[in-house]
């Protein structure tokens, strides 16, 4: 079936050019998912989801675009790490990931063959506690799932591979290697997002590495004398380098995209790559070219989770010229994610894997050289022509009586 020509409503054109009449028609019994979305998702958040599907498939998932995905909320316990995210990674549509540690931790349950059960949320939690069962809204599993996953993690993290300082991308790469070996032993491929990212060279970062059961187990082995240290500065520089050098694709015409599932700290860590480049490192940068978010967070409470793309422009996180290529859909990510994955896998040809994990060191070295050059130029321009003025530590001049 031919892809229908799409008039994006965010294009700069008169209202009459994109105000398409709604022409209701019965949904046929043999309709495909892509046709359902293109023709029947006509308004409100169904229309925003349609716009996301079309923007991703027609513009974002192109070889010259570097796509960063942020992941928050309990997505992997639902199975979506395996069913919806891993296929996007294998198809080359996601180049790097920033996730909560909890999503990566619960993802490992499936690689270990642990059982999580679909239930309902209207249960007696006191009774569940007595029965040693854990609840994530309408998902229930045994407490032993946590204990066995913790034991696996501590066994792996005690290995020599982890006995040094590293960033979370390297940490998750090595962890993904062990999980992949476990998949092979169990004869169950594609059981874990971590293993898929390892195979595809997609770096996974965690913005708050201590804020999850993975971080808790890292802390536990530190009490045993482990030399493992997670260094967040490594992550900040690596992600900034990825965003900065995204421009080099397609002969200097490359673009950068932020695909945000939920919000929270991973969203900020993905978007802060741009202020890190221009505000802190002093390098020229215009912001991400594409901003796509699925969230249930309101923008009017001031939280980052609900902050809209236009607000991000004021921070230099999003290119003002790219505002027409931004969409926010207010819905449950567990509804939207399977839909957009199925749509894009149907509409898009797979992209070559960028394997950014393998290029991290080289990109950071180049970023460091550019930063040091910028610092040197900045110092030359600021050579004092007058006697220095004493200041407080914050920089405020000290007024003399």
Curated annotation (Swiss-Prot):
Its EC number is 2.5.-.-. The keyword Transferase applies. One of its GO terms (molecular function) is deoxyhypusine synthase activity. Belongs to the deoxyhypusine synthase family. This is Deoxyhypusine synthase-like protein. One of its GO terms (cellular component) is cytoplasm. SUPFAM superfamilies: DHS-like NAD/FAD-binding domain (SSF52467). InterPro entries: Deoxyhypusine_synthase, Deoxyhypusine_synthase-like, Deoxyhypusine_synthase_sf, DHS-like_NAD/FAD-binding_dom. PANTHER family: DEOXYHYPUSINE SYNTHASE (PTHR11703), DEOXYHYPUSINE SYNTHASE-LIKE PROTEIN (PTHR11703:SF2). It holds the Pfam family DS. Keywords: Transferase. It comes from the Bacteria.
